[in-house]
Amino acid sequence: MKETVVALSLLATAAAAQAQSSVTLYGRIDNGIQFESGIPGGHAWSAASGNFGCSWWGLEGSEDLGGGTKAIFQLESQLNTMNGQLEGNLFGRHATIGFTNPSYGTFKMGNIGAGEISQDSWGTDPQLMQRYGISSLVRGRNWASAANAFEYQTPTWGGLYFRGQYALTNNTSWNTATTPTGQGRTNGIEGVYAFGMGDFRVIYDEVRGADGTFDDVYNHSRSLLAGGTLVFGPVHFYAGYQHLNAPNATDASVGVTPGSQPVGVSAPTSVDHEWFGAAWQVSTATAVTAAVYHANANHGNGNATLYTLGATYNLSKRTFLYTEAGYIHNSSTSNLALYDSAYGNNNFNPVTNTASNGNPNYGHSQEGIFAGVMHQF
């Protein structure tokens, strides 16, 4: 009889826990093909994963703690679904736990990863997270990450909310390796206001180098971004501006050697980046996107303009086809690439057919097009 009572009690406890908790498995798979010219060595066809957006899978869940408060968690992993390999650590995109309440907001801590506040910049770009877009002319600066982090987001008041982050990473006196490596401390704040015809956001964030300085404008810098959208029927218009600043940047800190760049060119400490575009929902299934981006860097690094045109076609609620074409024009001392390639000369070796990065030669252009399919679950 005691065994029966104990068993019934355990079942009741499990049922109650199940009623108060939820766990969701989610993810998406993005595979396709691409062609690009103007790259070191000429041109290339290649299979590609993540050209519209990264492939990932994850788990997220919550437990009702009463009084409107819930405990929440998220674990998320990025994959290259062309070869099945992990991109980085197992849960490099997200590994967080926290609490949420509709009256007090949301707090979480852990590996914020791809939730670093600068990544919200995609909300100001009609190309969203595609290969050719808002990250191209800032060499990936908008895709920063944050570990050992804390985040708080306010409730939404009449369409307005704020979000702040502070990530210790490897650069504080009480959270450091013997020899700091990689990225240092990050912190940022964002304000978003949504209204009837669109939204507007401002994002300020800092990403420091391992020594705590701003020594690389495309990786370890201050960023101020403002942008938004306006909706007129089936057309969404997008526009934005971003300023990057890294006062401690030198040729040595960005990894370039003397004489490897055009005369008069040295590591930039400032970049101005602006863009505008639109997304047109042609039909229930079809959308067309277009955008123009322009960036200018100081210290003789010149400027570049990127033109993009894309389209999507929904096969179902969870599966769609996509394509995007891009063309980038560089001034004589600029060598920005279609995708967020590293700063510096490509150092192409025609004998071994190898290069330091995917940048074109200085003053040269790049063209590319890709297509693929994405499924979400």
Question: Where on the chain are the PLM-derived regions?
Answer:
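N-terminal signal peptide c-region/cleavage motif recognized by signal peptidases
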Residues: 14-16
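Outer-membrane beta-barrel "beta-signal"
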Residues: 315, 361-377
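Detector for outer-membrane/organellar transmembrane beta-barrel domains
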Residues: 188-313, 324-327, 364
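Outer membrane beta-barrel
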Residues: 21-35, 45-171, 183, 192-196, ...
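Extracellular loop and loop/strand-boundary signature of outer-membrane beta-barrel proteins
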Residues: 42-46, 136-138, 174-177, 212-214, ...
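Residues that define the transmembrane beta-barrel architecture of outer-membrane proteins
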Residues: 45-55, 91-93, 144-148, 183-187, ...
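Gram-negative outer-membrane beta-barrel proteins
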Residues: 33-41, 79-83, 115-117, 170-174, ...
